[in-house]
Curated annotation (Swiss-Prot):
It is found in: Cytoplasm. This is Ribosomal RNA small subunit methyltransferase F. Specifically methylates the cytosine at position 1407 (m5C1407) of 16S rRNA. Keywords: Cytoplasm, Methyltransferase, RNA-binding, rRNA processing, S-adenosyl-L-methionine, Transferase. It comes from Escherichia fergusonii (strain ATCC 35469 / DSM 13698 / CCUG 18766 / IAM 14443 / JCM 21226 / LMG 7866 / NBRC 102419 / NCTC 12128 / CDC 0568-73).
Amino acid sequence: MAQHTVYFPDAFLTQMREAMPSTLSFDDFLAACQRPLRRSIRVNTLKISVADFLQLTAPYGWTLTPIPWCEEGFWIERDDEDALPLGSTAEHLSGLFYIQEASSMLPVAALFADGNSPQRVMDVAAAPGSKTTQIAARMNNEGAILANEFSASRVKVLHANISRCGIRNVALTHFDGRVFGAALPEMFDAILLDAPCSGEGVVRKDPDALKNWSPESNQEIAATQRELIDSAFHALRPGGTLVYSTCTLNREENEAVCLWLKETYPDAVEFLPLGDLFPGADKALTEEGFLHVFPQIYDCEGFFVARLRKTQAIPALPAPKYKVGNFPFIPVKNREAGQICQAAASVGLTWDENLRLWQRDKELWLFPVGIEALIGKVRFSRLGIKLAETHNKGYRWQHEAVIALASPDNVNAFELTPQKAEEWYRGRDVYPQAAPVADDVLVTFQHQPIGLAKRIGSRLKNSYPRELVRDGKLFTGNA
């Protein structure tokens, strides 16, 4: 694999020499940083099993190497990357996999280690969505996830990735993560804080990542991280699990932040060792039981992961002074809900008791039941999935609901050829050789729902959202 030139400040190299365990070679560290990062993907088990995914993609000649800490994760090598970007493959467009760096799969593995099965989870810094979607898959779309993102521009990307992967148990918020300890005290069974950091571990992906690096900025970032972990710890229920992670390598932003929390709440913080998380985890194990992953250990990004348990309650923070405002949705009455369920089922959309129908004007939404306890305590950017808009003739079913709820085994499902599926993703109407009988047609490709079409004569009218329409070369190789 080709080398690339990474910029290293002298002070950074000095700091790394001091931070690196004697069991590791500094020369190996420098050599690893100069190698471009291996591509990796995670199979979305909400839509397809790992075995079926491997069978589906076998004809492509992809080389898939299992990632030790994530059963559904693989390093991937492809001969046709220049001809067809991974993000333009049919399997990516339909949400069968997520392009995710291997080491960033570690925090969620730690969160669910030792049979942990939380019902309400918060992802404090969630965009672009790799870990939120991984959490949702581990929860099998059950329970509830609060996915927060401080950056307004990244909330849209977060929602797009959640929708593509067919996730239905998520509420999105847009706040500084430091508000949650006061706003939602002891509300979560598990919390992932993948903290904003100096990014020292990402030089293999971005050779200029350290251009603005300084020891002073590390100190400033660590101060923010302490405030974030303190807030997250207050939002965690007693007995709950907190995973703290970064993609940086200095101790100030990693071990020191966790040790500060333990010093602050000595009777409430228990470190849970990660040495048995996967075979070979001991190579990155610190004396505290954390994983400090230097890039040469597993040939991945530099990363840090700590897992801890809240053993008892701690004094509450002052209640927030802001007003949430009136919640604009009302629950749908049982009788009407039954009619909506019946109409949805006729086009292949079904859901279970983990979701409940709510209405706002002519909009119908499905919210995860597990998030209802948070209503009135925090303002949501987006909650659950938009099911439909009502109109005089019935319901206008929404694309995100089709991707999250549709069963490809529905009698009205219509499987497209590769050429017709590509037309669909380009936003064009489809003219199949033999038109289906039903007026509302669940469109599938590779036995996966990719949208809902209206049959008009021999034409299937495209309803693919304009913002998702793709140009350029797609999976059939035609531009």
